[in-house]
Amino acid sequence: MSFQHTTVLLQETVAALAPQRGGCYLDGTFGGGGHSRLLLEQCAPTGRVIGLDRDADAIANGQALVAQMAGRLTLVKAPFAQVAEVLQQLEIAALDGAMLDLGVSSHQLDTAERGFSFIRSGPLDMRMDGDSTTPTAAALLNTLDADALADIFFHYGEERHARRIARMVVKVRQQHPFTTTTDLAERIAHMTPGYSRIHPATRVFQGLRIAVNEELQQLEQALSVLIGLLKPGGHLAVISFHSLEDRIVKRLFRDAAKPPEDPVLRGLPIAQAQRPKATLKLVHNKPLTPSEAEIEQNPRARSAKLRVAQKLA
């Protein structure tokens, strides 16, 4: 099986984890395995990597690397929000480092049958795990009322014309349900004549994808769990691709990098050593971004931001 995906910020992310011989690391978004492969090289000969992915294609494609690494790579089909349960099953108590590469993979975008992109016509699916119990994008489009659709387009897609597009969807589906990516994209484009660089359906597709996969809820849950699973000195690296993801990462990192407020202790003559401590230290004040050379080689990397934090003792 071919799983085409160009790894973003590869060297920067793996360097941020500072892999050590014998360490145990989590790649919560295995994808094409680029980050995991380099991690395994740098924590050799005894270090191991646990790779998670919701996408069965990614797990199947990674089996060759599993065989090559002879017990040092374990792949599990699971969303990264379930990391605590996965590690418990593997009898792993803590991690030396963890990383997440958020968003949709090149393989998912380029496979028309997955329904993530309007560049090629495909079913309006957008499920990262292909789970038949999860509602598809088509199911949301064809059943939710205009207010609920507008909320998805606005809050998850940051689409300015969310209400107008939602009303169009409800009107059109009365004649025939939405079934393909190009059907939806063409309807939206027809409402926005003379658009320039960014296709007018881009934000709507982002909003639907995030809603279908509960991406923001999964991210918030996973980050809180991962911070607790890191060993003192361990690093957590997260690559985000749009402002909604980055805001969550930035907020949770900064909150954990401040000592928790305890109103009961405020103003009491307590020694500094006895006061609550911060959980994380920010490794960089600002996120790392791809070089011009990387963007030229892989234009999809343009919006990537890497934030890194270190667990304090």
From Swiss-Prot:
Keywords: Cytoplasm, Methyltransferase, rRNA processing, S-adenosyl-L-methionine, Transferase. It catalyses: cytidine(1402) in 16S rRNA + S-adenosyl-L-methionine = N(4)-methylcytidine(1402) in 16S rRNA + S-adenosyl-L-homocysteine + H(+). Residues 282-313 are annotated as: Disordered. The keyword Cell inner membrane does not apply. GO terms for biological process: rRNA base methylation. Belongs to the methyltransferase superfamily. RsmH family. This is Ribosomal RNA small subunit methyltransferase H. It comes from Magnetococcus marinus (strain ATCC BAA-1437 / JCM 17883 / MC-1). The gene is rsmH.
